[in-house]
Structures are given as C-alpha cells and as structure tokens.
From Swiss-Prot:
Record protein name field: Polypeptide N-acetylgalactosaminyltransferase 3
Segments forming domain Ricin B-type lectin: 513-661
Disulfide bond entries: C140-C375, C366-C446, C526-C547, C572-C601, C626-C649
Species name: Drosophila melanogaster
Tissue: Expressed in developing oocytes and egg chambers. During embryonic stages 9-11, expressed in the primordiums of the foregut, midgut and hindgut. During embryonic stages 12-13, expression is found uniquely in the posterior spiracle. During embryonic stages 14-17, expressed in the pharynx, esophagus and posterior spiracles. Expression observed in the epidermis during embryonic stages 16-17. In third instar larvae, expressed ubiquitously in wing, with increased expression in pleura and notum, eye-antennal, leg and haltere imaginal disks.
EC number(s) from the headed UniProt entry: 2.4.1.41
Family, per entry: Belongs to the glycosyltransferase 2 family. GalNAc-T subfamily.
Molecular function GO labels: carbohydrate binding; metal ion binding; polypeptide N-acetylgalactosaminyltransferase activity
Amino acid sequence: MGLRFQQLKKLWLLYLFLLFFAFFMFAISINLYVASIQGGDAEMRHPKPPPKRRSLWPHKNIVAHYIGKGDIFGNMTADDYNINLFQPINGEGADGRPVVVPPRDRFRMQRFFRLNSFNLLASDRIPLNRTLKDYRTPECRDKKYASGLPSTSVIIVFHNEAWSVLLRTITSVINRSPRHLLKEIILVDDASDRSYLKRQLESYVKVLAVPTRIFRMKKRSGLVPARLLGAENARGDVLTFLDAHCECSRGWLEPLLSRIKESRKVVICPVIDIISDDNFSYTKTFENHWGAFNWQLSFRWFSSDRKRQTAGNSSKDSTDPIATPGMAGGLFAIDRKYFYEMGSYDSNMRVWGGENVEMSFRIWQCGGRVEISPCSHVGHVFRSSTPYTFPGGMSEVLTDNLARAATVWMDDWQYFIMLYTSGLTLGAKDKVNVTERVALRERLQCKPFSWYLENIWPEHFFPAPDRFFGKIIWLDGETECAQAYSKHMKNLPGRALSREWKRAFEEIDSKAEELMALIDLERDKCLRPLKEDVPRSSLSAVTVGDCTSHAQSMDMFVITPKGQIMTNDNVCLTYRQQKLGVIKMLKNRNATTSNVMLAQCASDSSQLWTYDMDTQQISHRDTKLCLTLKAATNSRLQKVEKVVLSMECDFKDITQKWGFIPLPWRM
C-alpha cells in the first residue's frame, strides 16, 4: 500500500511540474507578443547580416509567409493602413545588404506584409539614403559622356505606396542624378486613400533639393492615365518613367540621356536589378539580356547572344546598348516631343498591363528603337503578388488591354493571341474600339507585324507561314489518328525529299483539317514537358501525355524550316550529352535524367532535328539518334517515368514513331 502511495505521489508531482512549465512558457509568449507590439525598433541591437556565401546566385533571406485557411493575423484596421511605421536604423540595409527583422517582430512583420505585398517592417528599418554599391562594369565606370545632355522630368506614379519605399525612390533619384540634368520630379497620385500620402507627403516634398510637384487623379484610373497626366505637366526635354518602388544606383541617368541625345527616336531602358520583397536586399542582374513576349503576351527576360546594335550597326563595345524586341514598361526614358509624335500611350488602356506590349510594337514598327543600356542600373522591388484591386477585376482589365494591342499591331497574329490566351476569344477584337489607334498606325506609316518578327526578333518562337505550329503526337499504331497519319505519309510521292522540313510542312498542311478531326484527346498522346511545375526556361525532361485542348500551350510546338523545335517562352527541344554536372543538377531537382531536354533556345546544332516522313522518325541532325519513348527510373523518387531519349534509330521500333497535328493560328 505504501509503495502504491509513493508512485501516486511522484505522478502527482510530475503533473504539477508540467502544468507549471506550460503556464511559464505561455506567460513568456504573451510578454514577447506585447513587447513586439509596443516596443520600438530604435533600441534593438543592429543585427549582423548573414555571412556571404559562394554561389552562382546571390544569397536571399527567405521569409515564410502563412498560407492556409483562416486569418491568424486578424483583420487589418483603418489605423493599420494609415500608420507610418518608418523608424530607420543607421546602417541598416547598407550597400544593398538584406535586413534581418528581429524574432520578436516576426508576427508583426507577417501581419503588415499584406499591406503592400512586401516586407514593410524591413523597408521601414532602412534609411532613405541607404548606400548602394556601384553596380556598373569597369568599362561603364570609365565611360565619358558628352556635355550638353538634355534635362529630364522623372515621373513616378503611386497608389497607396508605403512611405519608406516611395521616399527612398525619390531620394535615390535626387542623390544619384547630376543636379543640372534633373529638371524636376513629378509625383502622380492615383487616388490613394492613405492619410500619410496627403498633407504629410506635400509638406515633405516642399523642402527637397529638386523641384517636386504632386498631381492627384480624381478617381482610380490606373497607370496609363496617371502617366499621361504627369507627362502633360512635364517641363524636361526627356520623360523618365519610374515605378514607385525603385532605387537608382550610381551613374544611372547619364547613359539614358546620352543615348537619347544621339538619337531622339530611341526608347532607352536601364538594366533592372532586383530588390527582394522579403528582405530588401539589392541584387545586381547580368547586363547581357533582352526582353520579349510569350504566346500570352506576358513579358519575359532572355539571356542574350544577340549582337549589340546602335542605330542598326553591330558593335563590340560592351557599353553600347542592346536592342530589345520588348520592354518591361515600368522603367524607361523617351524624348518628350517624340513621345507625343508616336502617340504617347493608348489612353483607353486601364490600370496596367499590356501598355508595354503596345508601346514596344508601336515604337519598332513605326521607325523607332527600343534598347537596354548596360551602364544604367535601377533596382526594382519584385513582388510575387499585387496588393492592388480595381473595379472589374485585374484579369478582365489585362485581357481587354491585350486585345487592344493585338488588334492594332499584330495583323494575322492577333488571332493566334486570342485563340490561345486564357480569357480571350476571337470575339474580343469586336469588343474594343481601336479606331483612333488604327488611324495612328496609318498616319505614321508603320510596318507590318511580319516585318517586326523577321527583322527585330528573328529568333522568335511564334508561328509563321513557313513554320509548323501544332502538336507532336506519338504514333503508337493503335489510335485512329496514328493509323491515318502513318498511312498518309507512307503513300506520299517523292519521298526522297522526306528529310526536308519544308516538304513535311507542305504535306501536313494539305491534310490539316483531316488530321485535326482525327485526334482523340482521351487516347492520343502528345509530346510535352515531364513536369508541369518546372519553369519553362530551365532544364526539363520530355515525355508524352494526354493531348490537351487547343487553349492550352503545354503540348504545342513551333518547328522552323531549319529544324528547331520550339515552344512557348523560348524553350527548345535540345540534345544534351550526359555530362556529370547536368546529371547531378537534375537529380537535385528530383528530375529524371535524359539526353533530350527542353532548354532555352540557342543558335547551335544541339537543337536542330530532321524528320523522315517515310519512317515517321525524328532524329538529331548531328548524332543521327532518334527520339525514343522509354521508361526510366527516377532513383530519388523511386518511381518509373516515361521519358523521351535519343537512341539508335530502328525504323521498326514503335516507340520512335512521331507525327504532327497542325493547329489553326490565323484566319
């Protein structure tokens, strides 16, 4: 009996201890939470930035944001939206280093992240005049610019922008621009409702070293109308447009103005560096790149093997601008008079999105140029989502804007955009009134879109009259489509020319309607990326899967007359020798290794293929190996996946049989 009593006593004491410990930890948590809300950052010890790591990519301090059902942070109040939490700490974020928010402030950091879709607490710890490194190359630093450069008006549109971010943009413009070149700064408020952007902002800009004026839209109108208001009131020779969440680095302005002085018909863009939305670190991007648009007219960056060109002449000078088929649209400079001569903006475009597409096409097709200056670096806060809303919804606004741009400037290719862009249909062109913009195109005597593709963007991945566009189908010999295709190809006359893509295109087009009618989306298998979630610009293995409907681009390809098999976002079917480094990288990505990949398009023989209409085999031009569908084991995931490889050709092998189903892309 005594033994049992002793055991019960020990259990009771253990229970009391655990209860006391749980209460103690709960009390500590409550105190930390209260301190995070009431305590200021001014007394916090300046956190030491993480040590530098050797990597191909600059380090980035990742913040995990809550994603799930319910709102663990509570609803945002009017005070939350209107409060200005700017409390800079000397040296924080210096030289573009990341900001480390103290652990006690992490809850508050997550809560206020939602206001602007970036880490507001990190931004509010950084002084407005934080130091940045000189991101220019040695050649750019040594470059001398002529005297008598034109003056500029810097136009910044904002809507409910964070105080610290907006003012850091303005401060960087003032501190890193030669005073005699900076005519003024024009701020355009697109109907902000946050109190600190009213009288407080007006009082602040009155004492700036550069004349700064604020214009306010009477109602929420979007980027294009707001920029037009700023341009109408500008006095500088050049209009320089910046977003409200930027930081200009040393020497950013002179290269832009110098290029416009050389040619007033040039729209010149800076290199856009990355400011992290998580920790506001500043990361330099590489200079040798250019921009264009994918099949849905979304802007994309591509690494460049394009020749540097100035006024159409090739250049080996690394400081000369790079001609770019398209521009991102947020940051650029243009001669003020030329801006209006070329039709400024399409004033019927709402909010933002599509205006950069329209301007890129218009400038090139109507006699101007769009370029990127490698000597001008401006940082930009890139967000994973937008904090803004707009009547009608952003998706509807964007599709309307794209429909306007495509209808006016893309000729036959407008139908391709409307057929294969989500939210658009062929009827979209009838819903937009573009009479004035069409008249502008006629008045400026602009060139056709085919000229733009052939001369400005010859490496494009869009369909064209001399290209195949459609699906690549695996001819398993069982489906009706596979049997009909094989029968048609085997009965063709003059098969000695069968390895010429041009001949294949002609024969396929002659049976286009018949072949399209035969394809069975439930049974036929089409060539496609192995992983749907792999970025299209990175290495991705290739497989076959259920053929998708016409509106999806996952299994649609363009084939050029020289044998390049391309798909959306400038990705090409590529033969790669199995080098150890590539295999290791693919395994680290949980990828199945293969010697056939989807990779960024390049002008080399690894991406050139031939087709034999007699045997229905696709072979790599140099190695003479044929595309083959095989089962491969993913050792990391421990599962078998079907992948496309290049193997010795065997005309009897059913896994090497491929056909082409054309799809419509123009009227």
